[in-house]
Protein backbone atom coordinates (compact mmCIF):
# COMPACT_ATOMS: atom_id res chain seq x y z
CA UNK A 1 0.00 0.00 0.00
CA UNK A 2 1.15 3.60 -0.57
CA UNK A 3 2.77 5.68 2.14
CA UNK A 4 1.10 9.08 1.95
CA UNK A 5 4.26 10.81 3.18
CA UNK A 6 7.18 9.09 1.47
CA UNK A 7 5.20 8.94 -1.79
CA UNK A 8 4.54 12.70 -1.68
CA UNK A 9 7.74 14.71 -2.23
CA UNK A 10 5.75 17.95 -2.13
CA UNK A 11 5.06 17.35 1.57
CA UNK A 12 8.72 16.75 2.39
CA UNK A 13 9.47 20.00 0.57
CA UNK A 14 7.43 22.00 3.09
CA UNK A 15 9.18 20.35 6.02
CA UNK A 16 12.57 21.43 4.66
CA UNK A 17 11.76 25.15 4.50
CA UNK A 18 14.60 27.41 5.79
CA UNK A 19 12.36 28.81 8.53
CA UNK A 20 12.18 25.37 10.15
CA UNK A 21 15.53 26.11 11.82
CA UNK A 22 13.96 28.96 13.76
CA UNK A 23 10.65 27.13 14.30
CA UNK A 24 12.37 24.10 15.84
CA UNK A 25 14.51 26.27 18.13
CA UNK A 26 11.42 28.12 19.37
CA UNK A 27 9.34 24.99 19.83
CA UNK A 28 12.09 23.11 21.62
CA UNK A 29 13.16 26.14 23.68
CA UNK A 30 16.73 25.55 22.55
CA UNK A 31 16.37 21.82 23.33
CA UNK A 32 15.82 22.36 27.05
CA UNK A 33 14.16 18.95 27.46
CA UNK A 34 16.90 16.88 25.87
CA UNK A 35 17.96 15.37 29.22
CA UNK A 36 14.44 15.11 30.62
CA UNK A 37 12.70 12.94 28.01
CA UNK A 38 14.25 10.07 26.05
CA UNK A 39 12.42 11.08 22.88
CA UNK A 40 13.22 14.82 23.11
CA UNK A 41 15.66 16.00 20.40
CA UNK A 42 19.09 17.32 21.29
CA UNK A 43 19.66 19.42 18.17
CA UNK A 44 17.94 20.63 14.98
CA UNK A 45 18.87 17.61 12.88
CA UNK A 46 17.59 15.23 15.55
CA UNK A 47 14.29 17.15 15.75
CA UNK A 48 13.83 17.05 11.98
CA UNK A 49 14.58 13.34 11.98
CA UNK A 50 11.90 12.86 14.65
CA UNK A 51 9.35 14.74 12.54
CA UNK A 52 10.24 12.69 9.47
CA UNK A 53 9.91 9.38 11.30
CA UNK A 54 6.55 10.26 12.85
CA UNK A 55 5.17 11.62 9.57
CA UNK A 56 6.25 8.42 7.84
CA UNK A 57 4.20 6.49 10.41
CA UNK A 58 1.21 8.78 9.78
CA UNK A 59 1.64 8.26 6.04
CA UNK A 60 1.79 4.49 6.48
CA UNK A 61 -1.37 4.39 8.61
CA UNK A 62 -3.16 6.62 6.11
CA UNK A 63 -2.20 4.37 3.19
CA UNK A 64 -2.69 1.00 4.91
CA UNK A 65 -5.69 1.62 7.16
CA UNK A 66 -7.52 4.95 6.91
CA UNK A 67 -7.81 5.25 3.12
CA UNK A 68 -8.93 1.61 2.58
CA UNK A 69 -11.59 2.11 5.29
CA UNK A 70 -12.92 5.40 3.91
CA UNK A 71 -15.60 4.04 1.56
CA UNK A 72 -17.06 1.59 4.07
CA UNK A 73 -17.02 4.28 6.77
CA UNK A 74 -19.07 6.61 4.58
CA UNK A 75 -21.54 3.83 3.74
CA UNK A 76 -21.90 2.66 7.35
CA UNK A 77 -21.68 6.05 9.04
CA UNK A 78 -21.98 6.77 12.73
CA UNK A 79 -25.19 5.74 14.50
CA UNK A 80 -27.08 7.02 17.53
CA UNK A 81 -28.49 4.54 20.05
CA UNK A 82 -29.74 5.16 23.57
CA UNK A 83 -28.46 8.72 23.58
CA UNK A 84 -24.91 7.91 22.52
CA UNK A 85 -22.90 7.77 19.29
CA UNK A 86 -21.35 4.61 17.91
CA UNK A 87 -18.66 5.07 15.27
CA UNK A 88 -18.46 3.02 12.09
CA UNK A 89 -16.22 -0.03 12.51
CA UNK A 90 -13.62 1.48 10.17
CA UNK A 91 -13.51 4.66 12.25
CA UNK A 92 -12.83 2.59 15.36
CA UNK A 93 -9.96 0.86 13.53
CA UNK A 94 -8.54 4.22 12.49
CA UNK A 95 -8.67 5.60 16.03
CA UNK A 96 -7.14 2.44 17.44
CA UNK A 97 -4.22 2.62 14.99
CA UNK A 98 -3.45 6.26 15.77
CA UNK A 99 -3.78 5.73 19.51
CA UNK A 100 -1.37 2.81 19.44
CA UNK A 101 1.07 4.89 17.38
CA UNK A 102 0.93 7.70 19.97
CA UNK A 103 -0.48 10.20 17.48
CA UNK A 104 -3.05 11.84 19.74
CA UNK A 105 -1.97 15.12 21.29
CA UNK A 106 0.75 15.65 18.69
CA UNK A 107 1.21 19.35 19.43
CA UNK A 108 0.91 19.06 23.21
CA UNK A 109 3.95 19.40 25.53
CA UNK A 110 5.88 16.28 26.50
CA UNK A 111 5.12 16.73 30.18
CA UNK A 112 1.49 15.81 29.40
CA UNK A 113 2.41 12.94 27.11
CA UNK A 114 2.39 14.82 23.80
CA UNK A 115 4.97 15.00 21.02
CA UNK A 116 5.48 18.79 21.16
CA UNK A 117 5.21 19.06 17.37
CA UNK A 118 5.13 22.49 15.72
CA UNK A 119 2.10 23.58 13.74
CA UNK A 120 3.79 22.87 10.40
CA UNK A 121 4.37 19.20 11.24
CA UNK A 122 0.86 18.79 12.67
CA UNK A 123 -0.66 20.31 9.51
CA UNK A 124 1.38 17.89 7.38
CA UNK A 125 -0.22 15.04 9.32
CA UNK A 126 -3.68 16.63 8.99
CA UNK A 127 -3.13 17.06 5.24
CA UNK A 128 -2.46 13.32 4.87
CA UNK A 129 -5.32 12.19 7.12
CA UNK A 130 -7.74 14.42 5.19
CA UNK A 131 -6.56 12.97 1.90
CA UNK A 132 -7.21 9.47 3.28
CA UNK A 133 -10.64 10.22 4.80
CA UNK A 134 -12.03 13.72 5.30
CA UNK A 135 -14.58 12.52 7.85
CA UNK A 136 -11.92 10.98 10.06
CA UNK A 137 -9.92 14.20 9.98
CA UNK A 138 -12.93 15.88 11.62
CA UNK A 139 -12.58 13.54 14.60
CA UNK A 140 -8.82 13.18 14.87
CA UNK A 141 -7.90 16.86 14.42
CA UNK A 142 -10.24 17.92 17.24
CA UNK A 143 -7.38 16.92 19.53
CA UNK A 144 -6.29 20.48 18.81
CA UNK A 145 -9.06 21.66 21.20
CA UNK A 146 -6.60 20.73 23.93
CA UNK A 147 -4.68 23.88 22.96
CA UNK A 148 -7.47 25.92 24.56
CA UNK A 149 -7.09 24.07 27.86
CA UNK A 150 -3.31 24.44 27.61
CA UNK A 151 -3.53 28.19 26.98
CA UNK A 152 -6.28 29.13 29.43
CA UNK A 153 -6.96 26.26 31.85
CA UNK A 154 -5.69 25.78 35.38
CA UNK A 155 -2.62 23.61 35.89
CA UNK A 156 -4.66 20.76 37.37
CA UNK A 157 -7.00 20.89 34.35
CA UNK A 158 -4.03 20.71 32.00
CA UNK A 159 -2.55 17.73 33.82
CA UNK A 160 -5.87 15.90 33.94
CA UNK A 161 -7.43 16.57 30.54
CA UNK A 162 -4.47 17.08 28.22
CA UNK A 163 -2.82 13.88 29.42
CA UNK A 164 -6.06 12.02 28.61
CA UNK A 165 -6.12 13.50 25.11
CA UNK A 166 -2.53 12.38 24.58
CA UNK A 167 -3.56 8.86 25.63
CA UNK A 168 -6.38 8.85 23.08
CA UNK A 169 -9.42 10.68 24.48
CA UNK A 170 -11.54 12.42 21.83
CA UNK A 171 -12.69 16.05 21.98
CA UNK A 172 -15.38 18.37 20.68
CA UNK A 173 -16.20 22.06 20.80
CA UNK A 174 -19.87 22.62 21.69
CA UNK A 175 -20.61 26.11 20.45
CA UNK A 176 -23.64 26.40 18.14
CA UNK A 177 -27.28 26.22 19.20
CA UNK A 178 -30.66 26.13 17.40
CA UNK A 179 -30.83 29.95 17.45
CA UNK A 180 -27.13 30.75 17.68
CA UNK A 181 -25.08 29.66 14.69
CA UNK A 182 -22.77 32.30 13.28
CA UNK A 183 -24.26 34.68 15.87
CA UNK A 184 -22.61 32.93 18.81
CA UNK A 185 -23.17 35.84 21.17
CA UNK A 186 -26.83 34.74 21.21
CA UNK A 187 -25.98 31.38 22.81
CA UNK A 188 -28.37 30.55 25.66
CA UNK A 189 -27.17 27.23 27.10
CA UNK A 190 -27.30 28.06 30.79
CA UNK A 191 -24.48 27.64 33.29
CA UNK A 192 -25.30 27.94 36.98
CA UNK A 193 -22.97 27.40 39.91
CA UNK A 194 -23.96 24.59 42.28
CA UNK A 195 -22.75 25.71 45.69
CA UNK A 196 -23.48 22.37 47.35
CA UNK A 197 -21.54 20.33 44.80
CA UNK A 198 -18.86 22.96 44.19
CA UNK A 199 -19.24 22.80 40.40
CA UNK A 200 -21.09 24.35 37.48
CA UNK A 201 -24.25 22.82 35.98
CA UNK A 202 -25.13 23.11 32.30
CA UNK A 203 -28.67 23.02 30.90
CA UNK A 204 -29.86 23.52 27.33
CA UNK A 205 -29.36 22.34 23.76
CA UNK A 206 -26.41 22.43 21.37
CA UNK A 207 -26.81 21.68 17.66
CA UNK A 208 -24.50 20.79 14.74
CA UNK A 209 -21.75 19.63 17.09
CA UNK A 210 -19.01 17.68 15.33
CA UNK A 211 -18.11 14.52 17.25
CA UNK A 212 -20.72 15.51 19.83
CA UNK A 213 -20.38 12.37 21.95
CA UNK A 214 -16.66 12.88 22.55
CA UNK A 215 -14.86 12.13 25.80
CA UNK A 216 -14.05 15.76 26.64
CA UNK A 217 -16.10 18.79 25.55
CA UNK A 218 -15.33 22.49 25.46
CA UNK A 219 -18.70 24.16 25.98
CA UNK A 220 -19.74 27.78 25.45
CA UNK A 221 -22.46 28.67 27.97
CA UNK A 222 -24.13 31.72 29.49
CA UNK A 223 -22.85 32.10 33.02
CA UNK A 224 -24.02 35.64 33.75
CA UNK A 225 -27.70 35.93 34.61
CA UNK A 226 -29.58 38.60 32.65
CA UNK A 227 -26.95 39.14 29.94
CA UNK A 228 -27.72 38.90 26.23
CA UNK A 229 -24.39 39.52 24.52
CA UNK A 230 -21.01 37.83 24.25
CA UNK A 231 -19.76 39.29 27.53
CA UNK A 232 -22.06 36.98 29.46
CA UNK A 233 -20.58 33.80 28.01
CA UNK A 234 -17.92 31.60 29.60
CA UNK A 235 -16.04 28.47 28.54
CA UNK A 236 -16.55 25.18 30.36
CA UNK A 237 -15.06 21.70 30.28
CA UNK A 238 -17.51 18.80 30.36
CA UNK A 239 -16.29 15.24 30.98
CA UNK A 240 -18.44 12.54 29.39
CA UNK A 241 -17.73 10.26 32.34
CA UNK A 242 -19.75 12.60 34.59
CA UNK A 243 -22.93 12.08 32.53
CA UNK A 244 -25.76 14.55 32.00
CA UNK A 245 -25.53 14.96 28.21
CA UNK A 246 -27.66 12.99 25.74
CA UNK A 247 -27.27 12.82 21.97
CA UNK A 248 -30.77 13.49 20.65
CA UNK A 249 -29.92 12.77 17.02
CA UNK A 250 -27.21 12.71 14.37
CA UNK A 251 -27.73 15.02 11.40
CA UNK A 252 -28.18 13.39 7.99
CA UNK A 253 -25.49 14.71 5.65
CA UNK A 254 -24.57 14.23 1.99
CA UNK A 255 -21.06 13.12 2.90
CA UNK A 256 -18.44 12.76 5.66
CA UNK A 257 -20.92 10.46 7.38
CA UNK A 258 -18.20 8.89 9.48
CA UNK A 259 -18.08 12.18 11.42
CA UNK A 260 -21.21 12.44 13.61
CA UNK A 261 -22.80 15.90 13.63
CA UNK A 262 -24.94 15.86 16.77
CA UNK A 263 -27.72 17.61 18.61
CA UNK A 264 -26.96 17.49 22.33
CA UNK A 265 -29.24 17.92 25.33
CA UNK A 266 -27.54 19.11 28.52
CA UNK A 267 -29.49 18.15 31.63
CA UNK A 268 -27.84 19.47 34.78
CA UNK A 269 -24.47 18.30 33.43
CA UNK A 270 -21.50 18.80 35.74
CA UNK A 271 -18.79 21.06 34.29
CA UNK A 272 -15.65 23.03 35.18
CA UNK A 273 -14.98 26.64 34.32
CA UNK A 274 -12.06 27.02 31.89
CA UNK A 275 -10.21 30.28 32.39
CA UNK A 276 -12.12 33.35 33.59
CA UNK A 277 -15.83 34.10 33.50
CA UNK A 278 -17.16 36.31 30.67
CA UNK A 279 -14.22 35.58 28.37
CA UNK A 280 -15.68 32.44 26.77
CA UNK A 281 -16.55 34.01 23.43
CA UNK A 282 -14.54 37.17 23.20
CA UNK A 283 -11.22 35.50 24.02
CA UNK A 284 -11.32 31.70 24.24
CA UNK A 285 -13.58 30.88 21.28
CA UNK A 286 -11.68 33.36 19.14
CA UNK A 287 -8.43 31.55 19.94
CA UNK A 288 -10.07 28.16 19.45
CA UNK A 289 -11.45 29.08 16.04
CA UNK A 290 -8.09 30.37 14.81
CA UNK A 291 -6.71 26.85 15.23
CA UNK A 292 -9.87 25.32 13.78
CA UNK A 293 -9.61 27.45 10.64
CA UNK A 294 -6.09 26.22 9.99
CA UNK A 295 -7.23 22.63 10.50
CA UNK A 296 -10.09 23.08 8.02
CA UNK A 297 -7.61 24.57 5.55
CA UNK A 298 -5.47 21.42 5.87
CA UNK A 299 -8.59 19.33 5.39
CA UNK A 300 -9.44 21.25 2.20
CA UNK A 301 -5.93 20.71 0.84
CA UNK A 302 -6.05 16.99 1.63
CA UNK A 303 -9.42 16.62 -0.09
CA UNK A 304 -8.08 18.56 -3.08
CA UNK A 305 -5.11 16.19 -3.31
CA UNK A 306 -7.42 13.17 -3.31
CA UNK A 307 -9.68 14.78 -5.93
CA UNK A 308 -6.69 15.60 -8.14
CA UNK A 309 -5.43 12.03 -7.97
CA UNK A 310 -8.88 10.69 -8.88
CA UNK A 311 -9.07 13.11 -11.81
CA UNK A 312 -5.67 12.07 -13.15
CA UNK A 313 -6.39 8.36 -12.74
CA UNK A 314 -9.71 8.67 -14.57
CA UNK A 315 -8.29 10.84 -17.35
CA UNK A 316 -5.52 8.31 -17.96
CA UNK A 317 -7.81 5.27 -18.13
CA UNK A 318 -10.86 6.75 -19.88
CA UNK A 319 -10.38 6.43 -23.64
CA UNK A 320 -12.22 8.29 -26.40
CA UNK A 321 -11.37 8.52 -30.08
CA UNK A 322 -8.74 5.86 -29.57
CA UNK A 323 -6.67 7.57 -26.88
CA UNK A 324 -6.77 8.49 -23.15
CA UNK A 325 -8.72 11.69 -22.63
CA UNK A 326 -5.79 13.23 -20.72
CA UNK A 327 -4.08 13.54 -24.10
CA UNK A 328 -6.85 15.89 -25.24
CA UNK A 329 -5.94 19.54 -24.71
CA UNK A 330 -9.17 20.66 -22.96
CA UNK A 331 -8.96 17.81 -20.44
CA UNK A 332 -5.22 18.26 -19.90
CA UNK A 333 -5.89 21.95 -19.29
CA UNK A 334 -8.51 21.15 -16.64
CA UNK A 335 -6.19 18.72 -14.87
CA UNK A 336 -3.33 21.25 -14.96
CA UNK A 337 -5.66 23.88 -13.51
CA UNK A 338 -6.59 21.60 -10.63
CA UNK A 339 -2.92 20.96 -9.88
CA UNK A 340 -2.05 24.66 -10.00
CA UNK A 341 -4.81 25.54 -7.53
CA UNK A 342 -3.83 22.62 -5.29
CA UNK A 343 -0.19 23.71 -5.17
CA UNK A 344 -1.18 27.33 -4.51
CA UNK A 345 -3.53 26.49 -1.63
CA UNK A 346 -0.99 24.11 -0.10
CA UNK A 347 1.66 26.85 -0.24
CA UNK A 348 -0.71 29.25 1.55
CA UNK A 349 -1.53 26.61 4.18
CA UNK A 350 2.08 25.96 5.15
CA UNK A 351 3.10 29.60 5.00
CA UNK A 352 0.27 30.32 7.46
CA UNK A 353 1.39 27.42 9.66
CA UNK A 354 4.91 28.87 9.73
CA UNK A 355 3.50 32.24 10.84
CA UNK A 356 1.63 30.49 13.66
CA UNK A 357 4.80 28.72 14.79
CA UNK A 358 6.88 31.87 14.75
What are the functions of these language-model segments?
Residues 141-142, 153-189, 198, 353, ...:
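Internal maturation/activation junctions in enzymes
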Residues 179-182, 208-211, 227, 253-260:
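Short Gly/Pro-enriched turn/cap motifs at secondary-structure boundaries
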Residues 199, 203-245:
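A short core secondary-structure module
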Residues 293-358:
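Extended amphipathic alpha-helical segments enriched in small hydrophobics
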Residues 81-96, 100-108, 172-201, 205-216:
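Flexible, glycine/threonine-enriched loop-and-boundary segments that flank and lead into catalytic domains
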Residues 76-86, 109-115, 143-152, 175-180, ...:
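Conserved short loop/turn motifs at secondary-structure junctions
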Residues 1-136, 156, 160:
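Amphipathic, small/basic residue-rich leader segments at the start of a protein or domain
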Residues 241-244, 248, 253, 260-292, ...:
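A glycine-rich, basic-preceded beta-loop-alpha segment at the flavin cofactor/substrate interface
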